Amino acid sequence: MNKTSKAGAQIYKRLLTYVKPHRGLFAISILGFFMYSGTQTLFAALIKHIIDTLQTETREGMNYLPLLFSGLIVVHGIGTYIGNYFLAKVSTNVVHALRCEIFNQYTRLPTAYFDANNSGYMIAKITNNVGQVTQAVTDAARTFVREGFTAVGLLIYLFYSNWMLSLVFVGITPIIVVLVGYVSKRLRGISKRVQESIGDMTHITSEIVGGHRVVHSYGGEEYERRRFLESSLYNRRQSLKLATTMAIHSPIMQFILAIALSFLMYMALYFMKQASVGEFVGYLTAAFLLPKPIRALSDANSEIQKGIAAAETLFEILDEPGELDEGTYQVERCKGALEFKNLSFTYAGANEPALIDISFKAEPGQIIALVGASGGGKSTLANLVSRFYPHDQGEILLDGVEINTYQLANLRKQLALVNQQVTLFNDTIANNIAYGSLATASRSEIAQAATDAYAMEFVAKYEQGLDTEIGENGVKLSGGQRQRLALARALLKDAPILILDEATSALDTESERYIQAALQKVMSNRTTLVIAHRLSTIEGADVILVMDHGRIVERGSHKELIAKNGVYARLHSMQFKEHGSDDRPEAAVELSNSCIA
């Protein structure tokens, strides 16, 4: 057995471990298929018995034969039902368990995994690939058990009747083994490429569905059609290769069996001269019944190989290490003191570090603003606080304790994150505010959070209020409304540390007035990290850190940095000239004044 065959056997063996919890049901299905297969073998024996009886007994003495034949048919039917029904129960349970395990693993995987793998492939694995495994566990397994028993039963009968003649089947076994091994290897490789192409098509489709406005606005329809056409053509080519391999394999197998049966018939005419007519006909009947289960086993092998290829990709996901969570320290509510000591970080596969020797401290309740050009490392810093990525060097301390020492869930309980790209779910407004661990919040608490975030201003206009469905990712809401729901979620969480990552940069002036007013309540008595491009919104921060190429190049208050006439002063001057003082939202000025006070 070569390495590929061994790997395939190990994968299928691992797949069958999912059957173990349902071994009782599986045993019943095996019993049913044993009944089915037994009747196939007994049918050949019955033919022998009928012919011999016709030669030795009167017709009146054969009245039991129709009853015996009917009994075999009934047992055959009962066996078929029991085998199919209970194996179907096992297979649906296995697929359900595997699909849930894959989904649960997605919830445990680190952010770096999602960065490295596109969503289309990940979705295809939990839909299409699990479906391929279903075929391997259900139809193919059913065929292997049922037809395998039938083939074994017929071979036992043949060897019992005339073992010398039956050695013909032993002679062709090596040829069949080599053929099946070659075809299995080829089928598995092609199946994997077919599954990858389905993932690619899913990815392209998800992109055009999610970005249809951009596609239409920039005339990308033809480009997207070409992308999908190329992907679909590749899928078609691989699918045809798969079909061709299966189509050639079956006739070759039948040809080998036909040669063996022809030789067997020729030999039987000479070596079974002393046998009765019944023995001769019964033997040939069993021999000619044998190709059907062997052909079925050959076809089932195709489904098995496709299932193994699919299972391999699923097990790759399951074998991925989850987020590192070795910390044990827990606290009900931290004070909110954040300190960064000589922090450095480089993304996987990147040549340049994203952060270099970052050191600063945020006291409880302070507002720390991070500003600078895009790519300066501001968002990276926020991601490290949440432990979306493990930092390479240095320390991040929360209340004097290294964040890696905290239990991961407990650490994130202390943080509320609001991004520029708000994530909302295809659910009600209330369920989007009270999401995840916040689901236990009362109706009044949800309404209060929405009020404090100035979201009730638009929620009240809907007939169903907080129970209004907002569509996929909040498609029925404006940008400002979506942002206010994100702030309401942060308010409801009531975490001691708030991270605002470009929370207002994409909003119009009117929406920003609402958001800035809501931010005053959100940031009250919380340690806040504010990442902002609009410098007018962070003038009242306690400390402003100016970042450039992963380093802190300036730090101080707004007045101090303006007085330095350095990087911050130039950025501020550029924005002021570009937008003018009249474009600054009144609420932003109020926020600045309130923060300074």
Language-model region placement:
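Hydrophobic alpha-helical transmembrane bundles that constitute the permease/transmembrane domains
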Residues: F34-L42, I73-Y81, V133-A136, A140-V152, ...
